[in-house]
Curated annotation (Swiss-Prot):
SUPFAM superfamilies: HRDC-like, P-loop containing nucleoside triphosphate hydrolases. The lineage of its organism: Bacteria, Pseudomonadati, Pseudomonadota, Gammaproteobacteria, Pasteurellales. The keyword DNA damage applies. The gene is recQ. This is ATP-dependent DNA helicase RecQ. GO terms for molecular function: 3'-5' DNA helicase activity; ATP binding; ATP hydrolysis activity; DNA binding; four-way junction helicase activity; metal ion binding.
Length: 632
């Protein structure tokens, strides 16, 4: 286990922290312990500031190596590092990964038995721990301070720091107590970290935590390997199933806004042959843990969940995240989509949308008592609505929201890959508006379309609407076409949806009059009916060339090892590391240690069978024989 020395990656000789500068020590830790050849952008800057004893605020996108920003200083400093984390599952996941890298780490939280907590406390007293993960509600208690007073706390890291801000999307009252940490540990640098914080949230974090002249690092919010796609809902369940089946067994998360919908979607996917499980607060704790464990270990392909799922998971090979319903803020959307592609390999973020989703959330919000918090939530809901309705590059809209201004479209979102085609939509708009007006502005989307298309049903007959002049004036176009037209007219402010309990009626706004009179032109986007049947277009994100057959064999071996060790597969090696192995095909110790993600401890613990598989594979290629079985 890692304590106050480490092994050089090249010669494995001991390195004494007192004989070399801390900056060099940090680089040695990166190489020998974590197995990476160089720092990512921003990591070295943040680590250097911490090693100089400065407080810091780190805003860094998920998947960009945020955890290393505090884990490496923790190993460079003498003494203990406290890591404050809001989620029990996240603590365990981080500790498991640190242990796999040979680092003495543990956690204290309410899920542990008295005996387990005593064991952790004994480690603290003996001075063997380098990192201790604790919850925000526990860290400020008298009993914890009595315990920790016997330790040398050299550094404090606060993860998910946006939780301290009421302006943030995930405000947690217990985080507000953390402002006292600076007075409790006056000589320990404090690092606050988050992946999602706009300007107002950042200012709240700095103020509430009492950080002293902090180093502030704001990295790019861009996740170039994630493609953002919006799908208009026409037949949403059919569209969703078709998309998931097109993923061919890849790991994914589907978010919904209700437990009942979660259960329905999970069942529908299972009926289609997809390995899918539901996850929500209505399940027993043991059931939720079982689903989470199965997903982490690649025994379940898809988890359909409410927003509670995923925050505590560091699963690196999630290939897609689907929002079946509109999130309540861009921060939530960004954080949840950020759970895809954490290994830097191509991933999908798909948002299913219709204007009624936004209108319903807005109605629920207005039912809350008037307060500053409601005003904040309203602004955030408006922003995610504008994102969904945008006709410009979705990545630019996201980045602009977080204050990162770029001009060049990304070429990796639905708008860039398939720009909306415009047509003269004045006649279509007049047909829709006239129908809404003639039926008394008392009916919803489906009824308006039924009248437009001249359908014959009992409700239309009862209302005698088949006698109206507008009846059937849109029969030459499909239901999906008129759905798209109505949505665009809502976006443009010519029509509004009015909710009354569970019914939504369409009504004209004042802006509709010039359109009805033909006094102004109107361009509309051609309806994207193709999204009903097509799987999302191929990725344009650059992918390294590697041996696909060898990669599959390495993945299979990894699963066998992970099951035997009773750990998630990505803790052995993540997909990016396996792809690098499949590309460079290392067969010696030096070659394997040059692969990103292979550190000294992981090499000793896991690498040998991977090198054997690679040697077998290379031998087969030279002999032109069929690949050998893994069991051979």
């Amino acid at each position: 286990m890692f304590s106050s020395s480490l092994l050089s990656k090249d010669n494995k000789s001991a390195v004494d922290f007192h004989e070399i500068p801390l900056k060099q020590t940090a680089l040695d830790v990166l190489h020998a312990v974590f197995g990476y050849q160089s720092f990512r952008k921003g990591q070295e800057e943040v680590i250097d500031a911490t090693l100089m004893g400065k407080d810091s605020l780190v805003i860094m996108a998920t998947g960009n190596g945020k955890s290393l920003c505090y884990q490496i200083p923790a190993l460079c400093f003498e003494g203990l590092t406290l890591v404050i984390s809001p989620l029990i599952s996240l603590m365990k996941d981080q500790v498991d990964q640190l242990l796999a890298n040979g680092i003495e780490a543990d956690y204290l939280n309410s899920s542990q038995t008295f005996t387990e907590q005593q064991q952790v406390q004994n480690k603290l007293m003996s001075g063997t721990l380098k990192l201790l993960y604790v919850s925000p509600e526990k860290v400020m208690t008298t009993s914890f301070f009595h315990l920790i007073s016997h330790c040398k706390v050299s550094f404090v890291a606060i993860d998910e720091a946006h939780c301290i801000s009421q302006w943030g999307h995930d405000f947690r009252p217990e985080y507000t107590q953390l402002g006292g940490l600076k007075s409790c540990f006056p000589h320990a640098p404090i690092m606050a970290l988050t992946a999602t914080a706009d300007h107002a949230t950042r200012q709240d974090i700095l103020r509430h935590l009492n950080l002293q002249s902090p180093h502030v690092y704001i990295g790019s919010f861009d996740r170039p390997n994630i493609r953002y796609t919006l799908v208009e809902k026409f037949k949403p369940m059919e569209q969703l199933c078709r998309f998931v089946l097109g993923q061919k067994g890849k790991s994914g998360i589907i978010y919904c806004n209700s437990r009942s919908k979660v259960e329905r979607i999970a069942e529908s996917l299972r009926n289609k042959g997809v390995s899918a499980q539901a996850y929500h607060a209505g399940l027993e704790t043991s059931q939720r843990e079982q689903v989470q464990r199965a997903f982490q270990r690649d025994n379940v392909q898809v988890v359909v969940a409410t927003i509670a799922f995923g925050m505590g998971i560091n699963k690196s090979n999630v290939r897609f995240v689907v929002h079946f319903d509109l999130p309540r803020s861009i921060e939530s959307y960004y954080q949840e989509t950020g759970r895809a592609g954490r290994d830097d390999l191509p991933a999908e973020a798909v948002l299913f949308y219709e204007p009624a989703d936004y209108a319903w959330l807005h109605k629920i919000l207005l039912e809350k008592p008037e307060s500053p918090q409601r005003q904040i939530e309203a602004l955030k809901l408006q922003a995610i609505g504008e994102f969904a309705e945008s006709q410009t590059c979705r990545r630019l809209v996201l980045l602009n929201y977080f204050g990162e201004h770029q001009q060049k479209p990304c070429q990796n979102c639905d708008i860039c890959l398939d720009p909306p085609k415009q047509y003269d939509g004045l006649i279509d708009a007049q047909k829709v508006m006239s129908t809404i007006y003639r039926i008394g502005q008392r009916f919803g989307v489906h009824y308006v379309i039924a009248v437009l298309r001249g359908l014959s049903n009992q409700k239309i007959k009862d209302n005698q609407h088949e006698q109206l002049s507008v009846y059937g004036i849109g029969k030459d176009k499909s239901k999906e076409h008129w759905q798209s037209v109505i949505r665009q007219l809502i976006h443009l402010g010519f029509i509004k949806q009015v909710f009354d309990h569970f019914n939504a009626t369409l009504q004209l706004t004042e802006n509709a009059k010039p359109i009805l009179r033909g006094e102004q032109p109107l361009s509309l986007a051609m309806p994207r009916i193709s999204s009903l049947t097509s799987v999302v277009a191929p990725q344009r994100y650059a992918i390294a060339q590697y041996d696909k057959d060898l990669f599959a064999r390495l993945r299979f071996l990894r699963k066998q090892i992970a099951d035997k060790e009773n750990i998630p597969a990505y803790i052995v090696f993540n997909d990016a590391t396996l792809q690098e192995m499949a590309q460079y095909q290392p067969t010696t110790k030096a070659e394997m240690l040059a692969i990103n993600g292979v550190g000294a401890t992981k090499f000793e613990r896991f690498a040998q069978p991977f090198m054997q598989i690679i040697q077998q594979h290379k031998k087969v290629l030279t002999q032109h024989e069929p690949p050998l079985s893994l069991e051979s």
